């Protein structure tokens, strides 16, 4: 069983998301520790990027704040490496294709892969392949190698359609990293097709559009989850996009194997800044309990 699937063995999984470097990396580390200590089963880490197309205003603004702090992809890798020395729960990156393509090539723009490596180092990595040190590789291979070296268990790429996943999946698989599929409301055939190749868990998108807090979630999520389970009985399903309240978490916990919350957490961080860790820890505990209320009652 993969490390990510293990996260779904402790009742209904609660999966929080944060943008790394907002308001700063030290606070990010404190928040991650607080979430882990208060029941988070898996944590999604957003790498700051200048064009996060799947994100709504709340997470877009968090990316802007992190980039103003000059946070690079390598800074995030170093943070994960430090956290991994004390935390055993699965850690998953949520990022974008350009961050990966540009990693280590020396051509990164702001928020697209970090400070990069000298051109001659990138050339050595390109020639050395899997035998080269992680820091000497570039592009998909370099990113995957460094992520594995730092202790990342999975990756979510919201701007990469299913038809293009094979450009990434074999490389990440080689380094023991699950490429997690997202399934939005779509045809039954497409849901089954995506589910059949899913790794780690399936991220079921509650609503079409970008991330953000929603008052009402009207999609027939039960039917979507049922289709996923029919196509791939072994893969856990977690629902995200729009979940913010304990009541919503309880409702989603009745349907799926896990609940994902991002914008509601990032919004609190944007308001509280360096005072956020304690509040986010308490919120994590509340949402984990709510996600499992129906499960425990059963």
Regions found by a protein language model. Give the residues of each.
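Active-site-adjacent beta->alpha loops and helix N-cap segments on the catalytic face
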Residues: 2-5, 51-57, 71-78, 138, ...
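Glycine-rich phosphate-binding active-site loops on the catalytic face of alpha/beta enzymes
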Residues: 45-50, 155-156, 161-164, 206-213, ...
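N-terminal amphipathic alpha-helix/helix-capping segment at the start of soluble metabolic enzymes
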Residues: 1-17, 80
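Conserved anion-binding
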Residues: 98-100, 106, 139-216
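Alpha/beta catalytic cores of nucleotide-metabolism and tRNA/nucleoside-modifying enzymes
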Residues: 227-235, 244-250, 254-298
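Catalytic cores of alpha/beta
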Residues: 28-33, 187-195, 243-259
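Short beta-strand/loop segments at the ligand-binding rim of alpha/beta enzyme cores
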Residues: 11-15, 87-96, 172-182, 230-240
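Active-site beta->alpha loop and helix N-cap motifs at the rims of alpha/beta catalytic domains
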Residues: 47-49, 61-108, 136-157
